[in-house]
C-alpha cells in the first residue's frame, strides 16, 4: 500500500495488493491531518491482485485542496490501513 510520487503536486497514484481469492469490499478514503474526510476515492468489490487509483488532490466537490499532509485509508473486510501522503503545490 503506497503512493507515487510522494510528495506529489498535481496527482498521485495509490497502489495496493489484495491477496484474497474472493472479491471483497474495498473502501479508499482521503483524510486531512485533522481527521476530516476530504475525498471518498473508491468503494466497490475487488479481487486478488494489484490495484491502482489516482487522486488528483481534490475534495468530493472537485475543489483542489491545499498543500499539507493527508492520510489515505484503505479499508477491506479484513483490514484497515493508513498511509501518509504529502501534497505540495
Residue positions per predicted region:
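Glycine-centered coil/turn sites that cap beta-strands in beta-rich domains
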Residues: 1-4, 8-32, 40-43, 52-55
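C-terminal tail/sorting-segment detector
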Residues: 14, 40, 45, 63-89
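Extracellular Ig-like/FN3 beta-sandwich strand-entry sites
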Residues: 23, 48-50, 67-69
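Surface-exposed loop/turn motifs at beta-strand-loop junctions within extracellular Ig-like
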Residues: 32, 59, 76-78
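Signal that preferentially marks extracellular ectodomain short beta-strand elements
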Residues: 53-65
Amino acid at each position: 500500500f503506497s503512493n507515487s510520487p510522494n510528495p506529489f503536486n498535481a496527482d498521485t497514484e495509490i497502489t495496493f495488493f489484495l491477496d484474497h481469492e474472493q472479491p471483497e469490499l474495498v473502501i479508499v478514503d482521503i483524510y486531512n491531518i485533522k481527521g476530516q474526510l476530504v475525498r471518498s476515492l473508491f468503494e466497490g468489490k475487488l479481487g486478488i491482485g494489484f490495484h491502482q487509483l489516482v487522486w488528483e488532490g481534490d475534495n468530493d466537490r472537485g475543489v483542489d485542496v491545499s498543500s499539507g499532509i493527508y492520510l489515505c485509508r484503505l479499508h477491506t473486510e479484513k483490514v484497515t490501513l493508513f498511509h501518509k501522503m504529502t501534497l505540495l503545490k
